[in-house]
């Protein structure tokens, strides 16, 4: 597809009955304080100057092609697809939660699995935010499936959170209860790194008092624990203060931890998400042991020139493969071919 055609492509992202409010991402539309950040599935709308909807009729009224999100028991998505087909809207579907453990949990229910199968086969196609989810979709249909990593506005200086005089280690995960997140192991590893390098640690913990006590019992020399949520821009500012973002996640997720690191112009160490594997091939968890990742992290904490070089290479990769321009071209080409 010609770049001019990609520039004119608009996408309606539909999350039927979802919690997020209707939101437009026009070229000249500035972000609002209470609007959703242009990340995750909102990024598909943002990179095409499209919009996010929760009401099917509103998405249909745009006359744009639709990306229909599958969530919950898929009943609302099934009804929405029927309306979209009746209105002859070109519609592709995507699982809203695409970590390996999340897909397995969602589709373990027989009725939900049957509904998923029907939706995937009746839609014009499917988009996956991870290569593994794309392969899973292809088990149910032979064509019309695309791996489209979630784009990030790395080319937009309004989202450039580069910062001088960084210090410390930011722990990218926060879920103790999900085994594949390896959050406990990450904290233990970071405790060791902090002891050796004298770098402070920051972690978010929205769990119960028991989890806060567990962190306290680890005996960090200097740790900052955030127990309250903050808006995305404030969160990025917090991430950007640190030398590295560290995680041991093995969930095959889309990779927002690495995406946050890209906007912070920092380095993500560990994790096997899609963005981690694309943007941080030198430091991601793919085919690396936890011990190797700890070694990499320790080296980067004490070698500023290497850390800056890896961050710069990640930014260059992202501008080529993960930017809003790249995302818009991928989506426009995919929908045109359906």
Where are these regions (language model features)?
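A short, active-site helix/loop in glycosyltransferases that binds the activated sugar's phosphate group
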Residues: 110-144, 209-213
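A charged, aromatic-enriched C-terminal amphipathic alpha-helix characteristic of glycosyltransferases
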Residues: 301-336
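Nucleotide-sugar-dependent
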Residues: 181, 246-258, 271-280
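Conserved catalytic-core segment of nucleotide-activated headgroup transferases in glycan assembly
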Residues: 25-30, 155-157, 161-218, 224-232
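Short beta-strand->alpha-helix junction loop in the catalytic core
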Residues: 99, 132, 147-159
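Acidic donor-binding loop of glycosyltransferase active sites
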Residues: 237-253, 266
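N-terminal pre-catalytic "stem/leader" segment of glycosyltransferase-like enzymes
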Residues: 1-82, 87, 286, 329
């Amino acid at each position: 597809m010609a770049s001019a055609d990609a520039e004119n492509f608009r996408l309606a992202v539909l999350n039927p009955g979802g919690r997020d409010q209707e939101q437009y991402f026009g070229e000249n539309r500035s972000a609002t304080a209470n609007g959703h950040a242009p990340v995750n599935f909102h990024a598909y709308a943002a990179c095409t100057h499209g919009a996010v909807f929760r009401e099917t009729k509103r998405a249909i009224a745009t006359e744009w092609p639709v990306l229909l999100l599958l969530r919950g028991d898929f009943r609302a998505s099934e009804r929405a697809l029927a309306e979209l087909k009746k209105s002859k809207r070109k519609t592709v579907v995507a699982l809203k939660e695409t970590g390996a453990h999340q897909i397995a949990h969602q589709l373990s229910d027989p009725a939900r699995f049957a509904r998923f199968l029907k939706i995937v086969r009746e839609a014009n196609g499917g988009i996956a935010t991870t290569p593994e989810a794309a392969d899973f979709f292809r088990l149910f249909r032979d064509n019309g499936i695309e791996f489209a990593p979630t784009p990030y506005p790395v080319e937009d200086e309004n989202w450039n959170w580069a910062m001088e005089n960084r210090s410390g280690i930011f722990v990218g995960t926060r879920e103790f209860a999900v085994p594949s997140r390896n959050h406990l192991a990450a904290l233990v590893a970071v405790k060791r790194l902090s002891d050796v390098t004298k770098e402070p640690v920051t972690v978010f913990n929205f769990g119960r008092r028991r989890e806060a006590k567990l962190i306290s019992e680890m005996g960090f020399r200097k740790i900052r624990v955030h127990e309250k949520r903050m808006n995305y821009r404030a969160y990025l500012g917090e991430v950007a203060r640190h030398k590295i973002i560290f995680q041991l996640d093995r969930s095959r997720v889309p990779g927002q931890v690495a995406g946050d690191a890209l906007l912070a112009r920092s380095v993500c160490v560990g994790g096997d998400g899609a963005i981690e594997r694309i943007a941080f091939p030198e430091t991601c968890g793919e085919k690396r042991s936890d011990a190797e990742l700890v070694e990499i992290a320790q080296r980067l904490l004490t070698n500023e020139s290497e850390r800056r070089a890896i961050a710069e290479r990640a930014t260059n990769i992202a501008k080529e493969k993960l930017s809003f321009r790249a995302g818009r071209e991928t989506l426009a080409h995919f929908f045109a071919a359906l």
